[in-house]
Amino acid sequence: MKILSHRGYWKNKQEKNSIAAFDRSFINLYGLETDLRDMGGGGIVISHDMASENCLKLEDFFKLYKKYNANLPLALNIKADGLQNSLKQLIEKYEITNYFVFDMSVPDALLYIDLNFNVFTRQSEYEKEPSFYDKAHGIWMDEFYSHWIDKNIIKKHIDNGKSVCIVSPELHKRDFKKEWQEYKQIEKELQIQDKLMICTDYPDEAMRFFND
């Protein structure tokens, strides 16, 4: 199981999407998920909510990422439409290859696909049939209110050549231990350690649990 820290490896909520959280994640060799928005004439910034002048610039984030030279996976959550061209320039400038973009609107996603981005589609209780499935590199699997992910669903995606990233239940304020046990069993039975990721608020605990 590949571990992605949710908005970085933060110790308190104020550290989410901060340099400190990103630095801590990379030091511990965890990939991460973070949020991208536009900042008017200021380019792309890191921010889950509405952007402000205090937000970290994406270019500075990529500089930090490249400093570690570890090629860790980056899940780039697209929070605003129309970022494709600016994002592509930065990805090419910093030679970012182990990444995927996701969570944008469907019309916006099609533009990313046309520009050959690594795009993940979504699957959840509300999105039972993932959009643009054939063109997606992988699936972002989200359990908002209940546990529905099972071995057969994951096997179908893997057999179709897709990578899979599961949203850990604690991100939706649900207990995660039972689901983690099931994910671990699925991973073991299908032998898909290199194709399965989990996005979590507890990266250290996840690393110990899934990779013991």
Whereabouts are the PLM-identified features?
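Phosphate-group recognition and catalysis centered on beta-loop-alpha active-site segments
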Residues: M1-D212
